[in-house]
């Protein structure tokens, strides 16, 4: 038992003090990237995206003691609403989540698939 305890103490001493979380911290109309070391109490990197009717999108990134993500479905953020994204590893809030850029492509893919199925149905059963 003493050996295990000594091993754990030695391992803790060798590891040194824990590193503070690093997040991008900024406010911008685009995907800003400004790394900053967070305070020891911060456990999350938080990104808040607000959709403003007159000024467009506003992106705020910061360190946060707590974070509650919103449950908006992909591409479902309306004007005047905001989406909160949370993560907890170094510089994890660099990129905005893929739903923002992927939603138009996904919509186009669904439309293309629907058109292809419709054409296939017309060719398969021309008497309908």
Swiss-Prot record:
Protein localization? Cell membrane
Q: Which Pfam families match?
A: Toxin_TOLIP
Record PROSITE patterns: LY6_UPAR
Q: Which residues cross the membrane?
A: none
Where a lipid (GPI-anchor amidated serine) is covalently attached, the residues are 98
Q: Which residues form the UPAR/Ly6 domain?
A: 21-108
Q: Offer one example of a GO biological process linked to this entry.
A: response to stilbenoid
GO CC terms of this entry: cell surface; plasma membrane; side of membrane
Q: How does it sit in the membrane?
A: Lipid-anchor; GPI-anchor
The task this protein performs is described as: May act as a specification marker at earliest stage specification of lymphocytes between B- and T-cell development. Marks the earliest stage of B-cell specification.
Could you tell me which PANTHER family the record lists for this protein?
LYMPHOCYTE ANTIGEN 6D
Designated name of the protein: Lymphocyte antigen 6D
Organism for this UniProt entry: Bos taurus
Give the gene that encodes this protein: LY6D
